[in-house]
Amino acid sequence: MRTSLLLCLLPSLLLAASPYPEKTPDTPGNRLIDRYFAEQTREITAENGLAQITTAADWEAKAPEYRRQLFEMLGLDPLPEKTPLNATKTGELKGDGYIVEKMHFQSMPGLYVTANLYLPDKVEKPLPTILYVCGHAVVVKDGVSLGNKAGYEHHGVWYARHGYACMIIDTVQLGEIRGEHHGTYSKGRWWWFSRGYTPAGLEAWSCIRALDYLETRKEVDKTRFGVTGRSGGGAYSWWITALDERIKASAPTAGVTDMQNQVIDGCVEGHCDCMFFLNTYRWNFERMVALAAPRPLLIVNTDKDTIFPIDGVFRIYQNVRKIYTLLGKEGNIGLQVSEGPHKDLQPLNIGAFHWFERFLKGADSMAVLDEGAKKTIQPASLRVFTEIPKDEINTKADETFVPMAKAPAPATNAADWSKQSDTWMQELKAKVFNGWPKDIASVNPQKESSAEVDGIRMTAYDFDSQSPFRLRLYIVHRDGLRAEDLQLVALNVLDEAGWDEFCATYHSRFGKLIEV
């Protein structure tokens, strides 16, 4: 006769694959989860921020690996092939002191980036050039998406009127071809994590390819690239600044805060997937910000922004400023704080304009700007496509941007299998389960109660899993069973549906042991 032991483990953490609620219900379980996230945030802040960097040599030794990790966490390692851009101009319009080229390029075959290139009406020599990346502006007319670039045209106009080239690029989510950023935010696409995909990586790649294109233009001085954008565009400014040292000055606006704000204070609930890399290496976000060093960096924010609160922004600024100080470049980092909410505001714009005047054109720090950014162009006139290309893959980019992993060849002998399985286990621990505790503490098991019904014995134990979780374990077996007689041990880790089924099966007979 086959002798079996059934172990049922009830986690305190029951997660459903559904959109995150606007307000997390206040329950004992959720309070426990909040406590867990607070503990993890404190651990990450202490161990994976910038506190361990004490000398310039420390930073210079570690920064290349940090940059490689960021490429990986954005789904860009290995980097996609740089295929022909197939840049195409579809039209042009003229304004007071500037022209706008309406164009598109393909960051990879079929992945279209729609863009407007703003230039002064007279260009006599290569110009400092701004890559402007867009936030979540929805610009639609008669059911047709004009792209979020049309919501930020006033920035392009200002730069062109003041001696810059400026390219404004659409995002995949809110461009003329509407793709998807909200995979885990609201679409239940949890497989993005397993695939190693985040739309943040796709937008970073669009930025890299935009620079590739701009380098081909005679109007562009490729030694003087700057990047800016607000909200989502602030985040993409961070990605390209950290990844690509062709960016010589940056002014990300309302695009970053620290783990305390995001996790403990709950700001993450208001954010799109495109705002985050897949945090395999458990970074605090200041590490990504510091990859701008020692290049000129202006961190721009408002004092009443509820999704990028100023306290977290200031903590990041203070910690990253230490890196600039170690590198002898403290004058290259600045913090611009203006009054207001999470909104495109003129004082924020002026700060960015002044920063680029100083660091891309050599203007004096007391230089006075003659005007702010003014909206003057009808959005519909900036549209690039009259028809959406039939070969576009923007609408399914999440399925192709990060290639699927290829199944490895099976081992053919015991030695190869041992080596292969050891490698897999190391990779699983380093990547998939990197958040597990490194030191396994005592589980402190405690027998709570036991009962026998109709020859079946159930025993309940409590044990420590990982701080702060103390879990319940139910052991079910034939009464009188000896350990040495066991032939099979089955461990069931129960989700909510499994717990409901377990209760339906056993509660009528073992109700005193089972806490419902």
What would you call each of these model-derived segments?
Residues 4-13:
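Bacterial N-terminal signal peptides
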Residues 17-113, 125, 285-287, 293-295, ...:
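Alpha/beta-hydrolase-fold serine-hydrolase catalytic core, especially in secreted/extracellular enzymes
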Residues 124-222, 256-268, 274, 485-516:
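Cap/lid segment of the alpha/beta-hydrolase catalytic domain
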Residues 170, 228, 253-254, 300, ...:
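Alpha/beta-hydrolase-fold catalytic nucleophile elbow
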Residues 193-194, 202, 248-290, 294-295, ...:
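Mobile cap/lid helix-loop segments that gate and shape the active-site cleft of serine hydrolases
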Residues 219-231:
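Alpha/beta-hydrolase fold nucleophile elbow
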Residues 229-239:
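Glycine-rich nucleophile elbow surrounding the catalytic serine of serine-hydrolase chemistry
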Residues 242-248:
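Conserved hydrolase catalytic core segment
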